[in-house]
Structures are given as C-alpha cells and as structure tokens.
Amino acid sequence: MADLRKIKIDDTIIEVDPNMTLIQACEMAGIEVPRFCYHERLSIAGNCRMCLVEVVGGPPKPAASCAMQVKDLRPGPEGAPSEIRTNSPMVKKAREGVMEFLLINHPLDCPICDQGGECDLQDQAMAYGVDFSRYREPKRATEDLNLGPLVETHMTRCISCTRCVRFTTEVAGITQMGQTGRGEDSEITSYLNQTLESNMQGNIIDLCPVGALVSKPYAFTARPWELTKTESIDVMDALGSSIRIDTKGREVMRILPRNHDGVNEEWISDKTRFVWDGLRRQRLDRPYIRENGRLRPASWPEALEAAARAMKGKKIAGLIGDLVPAEAAFSLKQLVEGLGGKVECRVDGARLPAGNRSAYVGTARIEDIDDAEMIQLIGTNPRDEAPVLNARIRKAWSKGAKVGLVGEPVDLTYDYAHVGTDRAALESLSSREISDETKARPSIVIVGQGAIARRDGEAVLAHAMKLAENSNSGLLILHTAAGRVGAMDVGAVTEGGLLAAIDGAEVVYNLGADEVDIDQGPFVIYQGSHGDRGAHRDIILPGACYTEESGLFVNTEGRPQLAMRANFAPGEGKENWAILRALSAELGATQPWDSLAGLRRKLVEAVPHLAQIDQVPQNEWQPLGRFDLGQASFRYAIRDFYLTNPIARSSPLMGELSAMAAARKAPAPLAAE
C-alpha cells in the first residue's frame, strides 16, 4: 500500500490511501455522499454528477468525487492537508441542480412503481433536491425493452446511470446491453432487442437506483414495508451465498442478496433469486402410506408407526440428499447406524475420501481467487456449477490472472488455455516440472464434481492434489450440493459409496435424495418437501425446505453458515430433524435431544469445527496415495443449470428458463433452399 496521506473532509482529518477516490475517503470518514452511477464493485462512469464535492483551492467548480483520486488533490497552504467540503453552499446548489436535471424526464410513477419505498431517487430527492421544478416542457417517453422473463423494464424512468451496462459487461461477461445516442436521445438498450442470456442477470434489478429495471415475477405483489425480512443462506449451489428472504404471511415473495465479501460479494444467481415460485408448488403437505398399490393420506402417528414397523429388525440404508442441513444429516446417521444400518451422502457417486477434509473440501478459500495469478480448472464448468464463483474468476482474469481448463471447451465468459479434455491432460499437468518462479506466484486448483464422480474419481482427485502440491497452489473442491460438505463432516458416509450402502438393504430411508434411482426391491421411506422423483414409494413424510427450518450448511470451502427459518411448511409438514426425532421415539431408540438447540450441542460435540460459524477452518494436508487414471474425457456435473433440485424442478419459471437455454444451444435450422 502507498504511504497514507492526510486530508481534511469538512471538519474531520483522516489518513487514507492516495489511490482512493474522494467518495471512498468520505465513506471512511463516515460522511455520506449521494450517488447514482457509482458502485464500488463496478468501474467508474462519472455520469450522474450527483456526488459533487467542493475541492478547496482547486478549480472554482465542484468535482465528481467518484472520479477524482486523493493523490490528485493539491496540498493546502504551508503543507496543510488537502481539504474537501461536502456540505458547502456550492455543493448544496450543485446537487439541487443535478437533481432537477435528473427529474426533468422522470415520470411521477411512484404510486405504481415497484421500487417505491426502497428507491434511491426518492430518498435523494427528499434529502438533496428542492420541492419544485421549473421544467414545463413535455417529458421524454421511450419504449420498454423485452429482456426476458426475469427483468421487467420501464425505460421512461431510466436516468442513464449505466450500472446495468457495466454489470452485464464486467461481471456477467455478456455484451448484450449498451447505451446508444447522445444527449436527450441517449438510451439504454439491448443488442438487436435480444433477451439477456446470463444466469446472473437478475442482479441488475438490485443495481438499478430507480424503477427502470424491476423483477418481473415479483411485480405488483407487495410493498417493501409489508414484508418480513429474514437473513439466511442459499442452497441452490454449494457456494452458500448470503441472502435475504422476504415473506408476506406464509409465502416467500422474493429473495435478495446480502453482502458477504468472502463468499458472494453482493451477487446471486438467477436460480437463487427466482426459484421461490417452486416453494409453492408440488408441495408435500401431509403423510402418505401406500396400500394396495396406491398412496393414501395418513396422520402423523399412523405414518410414523408404519415407518417404525417397516424398519424394525431390517437391514437399513439411509440416503442423504443435496439440500439436507447438517443437523438432519447427523440425526439420520445416529438413527440408522444405531439400528445397524449404513448411511451415505455421496448420492451422485462422487469419490470423496471420508475423513480427509483437505481432499473433500481443499485448502483454499473462495476469496483466494481474487489474488490468484493462475487458476486451473479440472472437470468443472463454474458458469453452471457456481455462477457467482465464476464471476469471481472472471474478475481475477480481468486483472491479469491466467486460467486453464481441463475438460470440454465451454463459454466461461473469459479466455482460458484449453489444456485438454481427458485424463491424459490431467496426468500431463500433474507430472510437469514447475519452476520456482511459478511456484512463488499465488495460484489455485479447482476440481469439479463431474471429474470425481466416475470409477477413477479418487485417482483424478489424487492427481489434482499432486498438481496443487507441486505448484504450491491452493486446492478448492467445487461441490454442487449445498448439504454435501456438512454431511461429510458428520461422517454420513459408507466405505464403497452409494452401491455399498444400499447393497442388500431391505429398507431405504431416503432423506431428500430425489436423484437416486432405487430398485423396486427394498421398502422405501421418503422424507422431503416436494412431490418429486423420490415421492412415489411406500411411505412419504412431508419435511420442510430450506426457507422453512433453521439449519447449518457448510459451503464448498468448508465455511459453516446458518440458514434461518423465514416461513412455515405448508399443511402438516414438519422440520426434518423433528421428524427423525419422533421416529426414533417410535422405534424405541429415542434420540437424546428434544430441541434444535439440544441437537446442535450434540452435533458440535461430535464435530467441533461446526461451532465456528462463518469461519473457514484450516485443513491439514493429507495427500492421497497413487491411483491409476482411466482414459475417459471429463464430463461436467450439471447438464441443466435451472433444474438441479426438487425446488427448481417445481418452479414454472425455472422450467421456462431451462427451455429457453436449450433453444439457444440447439443448432439453428438450415435456410430453406
């Protein structure tokens, strides 16, 4: 960092990095400067002029604080600190003038605008504007854009801050939005009126400081002050993005991102943001028992008694799905293993070694990507498996990092060196001599689940670890299941994996593992939230989904985080841990807790690092032995980004987005001859 420099802001003297902009220095001093175009995670545009400040001793006009750096300030007389003023008469008059210009063409839509109540323009007009307008001419009107089923546009409200253009170009990595024209004819538009193709496009809704870009599914459904806001964690991928769930009564109305620099910064994927309509459809709201080949509704005592009767004295296997919190995984493990059964969470066949956290989690943090100069991807397509992580890799690439890929070539929104598609390319990488100069540069190896889900998965992982060790790189295992690391941590694994767990089982207790095909032989008890693939067996117990119960999730870097309950399960649905606790009592093996707090105490006793909420534990490096690689090419873990779990498959909007994505990938029809 450069030597700090003293500056005086109003009556406060602070020391700041001279490379900081004036608006950043003001924030450090605790002084709020209004802004519309400036955003700390986007490039500087300097086109709204709302952030004007007075530079004492500088030009006799206000300066844009977002575009001027501290090092450009002139020192005061006799070496005194440079001085800027944010509340002088000059600044006040300038802000009033800028606000008047911004409101010239802005319609009086506040009563019918979805941004009302959380609108930057409303707030800043009240704080810095005047209560009248001198403008008497007709206002400009523009046609709205069709950006697709997610973002609704009202372009007459647009103030041309260009945040949406900069986000789509710089963060999302698409070039479909831009600004055309000059002066009053300038407008934000999409290229050839195309709909947006990014799976992160919903973030422009949050970035828009006015009501020009709003959520199409949420439109006209609620006002901000009607909503109950709950801070929670996303489970649509294994990144564990920080989110806020807004509810009205029993319904989830929308999902928004929360800032977390170490995980998702302030972005979320479109699946995270818009999957909430799947929480309302195809829900299991009562227990069912199969009799004479047909499912019939049952009471809870009846269903639990039938489940206990089926399990007593039988060989049991427990399967743990992708969205199961650590508490429920721990509870099922205790229940099934107490009855002499086996439990398995690696239901996709991933060859993750039990007990070796450096191999099934890695040693790197997500934020290590920011400083990496070299990033090697092995068998992963992060654009589909973790879109927000992919945006972070793109940010590192834009700063000069080099990216390599072993796997099928795909569009990752940034350039990369394609090393190869098969195991031979990985073997060549892991056995290559690496110079000391290269080892000294920060680097990271990222391994996808598709790379380790085949028979030689452990060999792939061993070679990836060898590459990381040889190059002094951090290792990050990119999971696709939000509950996988937590279940691995509690030891919900069987030697030999899924096939070994269900081999010879007479009863299978399926806890939300809808993607597993179970033969017709064993008696199957399904516990889950949606009427998906798994809910067609012998006994069905309706559980809560991630917004309806508090739970502990461990993300792909090994960071324990708490998801909080925002609403209640429909009908007779119950929290997953509570169902297992009640079933244990019915089996005569009552689990030693009667509350979630009691369960967590036992969980932390067994796995102490789970008590370190929002901390990433250091994992001791334990290299794997030598394994022989196969010959196959790498296949990615996710084929359809929008339909990866029961909640997403129940969402009509996710189905529409999936169909649109498939249509874009389909070959164009040949021209008629």
Curated annotation (Swiss-Prot):
It is a peripheral membrane protein. This is NADH-quinone oxidoreductase chain 3. Its main location: membrane. InterPro entries: 2Fe-2S_ferredoxin-like_sf, 2Fe-2S_ferredoxin-type, Mopterin_OxRdtase, Mopterin_OxRdtase_4Fe-4S_dom, NADH_UbQ_OxRdtase_75kDa_su_CS, NADH_UbQ_OxRdtase_ferredoxin, NADH_UbQ_OxRdtase_Gsu, NADH_UbQ_OxRdtase_Gsu_4Fe4S-bd. Keywords: 2Fe-2S, 4Fe-4S, Cell inner membrane, Cell membrane, Iron, Iron-sulfur, Membrane, Metal-binding, NAD, Quinone, Translocase, Ubiquinone. Its EC number is 7.1.1.-. Signal peptide: none annotated.
